[in-house]
Every structure is written in C-alpha cells, then in structure tokens.
C-alpha cells in the first residue's frame, strides 16, 4: 500500500504556496496596516494642527533626540535614556523574573496534588480578581516609595497568571503517562523534566504573556506616584507638569513599542520551546 499525499483543495488558504511565502505575506499585511494607520495619523494631525495631537513624524524625531542620540560608546543612548528607560526596564525585569520563577514553582507543586489544588483554588481565584493597581498603596505603606515598593508591586500582581496557568497545565498531564513513568521508575526530577513540564509549557507561556503585560502596566503605574525619582512613568508625569506634550506622546509610543517587542520576544521563545503546533494564540 502506498501513502498518498493530501493535496489542499483548490482555493483553500495556502494551497499551492510554500509556508515561508504565506508567512511573508502575513507579515507584509500586518506592517502595511500599521503603516496605513501611521499615515492616517500623520495626515489628520497635519490637517487639524492641534498642539495636543502632534504628527507621528514629530514624535519620532523628538524621541530620537531625547533618548537615542547619544554617543556610540553608550549604544547611542542619551543621559535621559540611561537615567529613566534603563531603571524602568531593570525594575520590570526583576519583578517579572521573580514572579515567573515563583509562579512556575508553586504552580507545579499545587497542580500535581488534587487535594492541594482544591484547597488553594478559592484563594488563587480571589487573588487573581483583585485589580493589580489596588495593591500599590498597600506596598507604599509597607515599604515606602522607592524601588523595593515598585518591584514588590510588580511581583504580587504578575505572579498570579503564571501560578494559576502552571497549576492548570500540570493538572492536565496525561494520567496514563504518569502511570508509565511509575512503571519505568522515573525519578521525580525526570517526571518533571520529561512529563509535567512539556505538558504544562503551553499554559505556562500563556500565563507568562499575561504577566509580562501586567509587569509593564505596574512598572509605569508605580512610577507615576509621588516620590519617584526616575523611570518612564516619572518622565510622563514630569512632562505633563511642564505641558511638554511631545515628550508625553513619545513616552506613550515608547511604552507601546516596548510591549510589542517584549511580547514578540516571548512568542519566539515559546515557539522554540513548545513547537509551532502547540503555541498559544497571540
């Protein structure tokens, strides 16, 4: 018996096209939509002439002058970028890293025990329902203003999506595979490496992406508070107090670009570890 290759029906998406060409077409389509939106923004801003709605070209030029016109030995970063962008990214990276590590470890421990999961689930659902910015005043009282308060706010807000998704992913491990692992006498570490983690990875990355967004939001929110000395959020409030609308818009565009780049990088890691066929939808 010979195997027959399945041919996509005529007119179906991707029929007769290489996967690479389809991916290129999708990328071009996404970028064309973005370019069209920027062009409409530019034309509308020029036509309206409002100081509150500057053209994107002016915003981009101001952002380059403000943050990316430094010397080559500093990777073209200005003192303003080193003093505000890098501290924000450092706090966000620390908070997200702690939240991810704690969430994955606790999630696997909770998810592998039905009894522990049943006991902890109400607490987890309650904690997840609390709006993250509402936690910031609590940490201001406990830790006062400063970097420890900002990192703690990020950690306690970003840990829940990772923890809950990891626990649910660990629970979804095929029981038959667990039984086979017991027959083969795999050690707990081998079960974790070869059974539980591969099964939970799609859910883990779904939680990581939610936590990454929350980390960015809490990073900015905690920097908007009085007593903050640097950061992108500080740049926003300082520019607003001086009615420097170009800097306000530049900071907003910078935050959007950072969020997109970080999410794209995490998606690339997910595809590498999980496989194209098991990635979570964007």
What label would you give each PLM region?
Residues 94-124:
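Transmembrane-helix boundary motif in ABC transporter permease subunits
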Residues 82-90, 117, 124-127, 144, ...:
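Alpha-helical membrane-interface segments at transmembrane helix boundaries
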């Amino acid at each position: 018996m010979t195997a027959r290759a399945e041919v996509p029906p005529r007119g179906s998406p991707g029929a007769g096209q290489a996967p690479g060409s389809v991916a290129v077409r999708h990328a071009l389509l996404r970028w064309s939509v973005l370019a069209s939106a920027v062009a409409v923004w530019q034309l509308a801003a020029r036509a309206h002439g409002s100081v509150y709605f500057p053209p994107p070209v002016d915003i981009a030029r101001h952002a380059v002058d403000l943050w990316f016109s430094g010397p080559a030995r500093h990777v073209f970063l200005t003192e303003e970028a080193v003093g505000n962008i890098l501290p924000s990214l450092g706090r966000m990276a620390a908070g997200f890293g702690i939240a991810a590590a704690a969430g994955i470890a606790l999630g696997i421990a909770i998810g592998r025990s039905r009894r522990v999961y049943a006991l902890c689930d109400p607490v987890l659902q309650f904690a997840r329902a609390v709006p993250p910015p509402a936690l910031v005043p609590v940490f201001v009282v406990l830790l006062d203003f400063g970097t420890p308060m900002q990192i703690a706010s990020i950690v306690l807000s970003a840990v829940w999506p990772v923890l809950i998704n990891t626990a649910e992913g660990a629970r979804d491990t095929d029981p038959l595979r667990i039984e086979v692992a017991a027959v083969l006498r795999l050690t707990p570490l081998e079960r974790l490496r070869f059974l539980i983690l591969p099964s939970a990875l799609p859910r883990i990355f779904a939680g990581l992406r939610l936590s990454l967004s929350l980390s960015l939001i809490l990073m900015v929110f905690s920097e908007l508070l009085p007593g903050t000395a640097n950061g992108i959020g500080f740049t926003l409030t300082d520019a607003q107090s001086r009615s420097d609308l170009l800097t306000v818009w530049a900071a907003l565009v910078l935050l959007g670009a950072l969020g997109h780049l970080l999410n794209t990088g995490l998606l690339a890691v997910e595809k590498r570890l999980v496989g194209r066929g098991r990635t979570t939808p964007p």
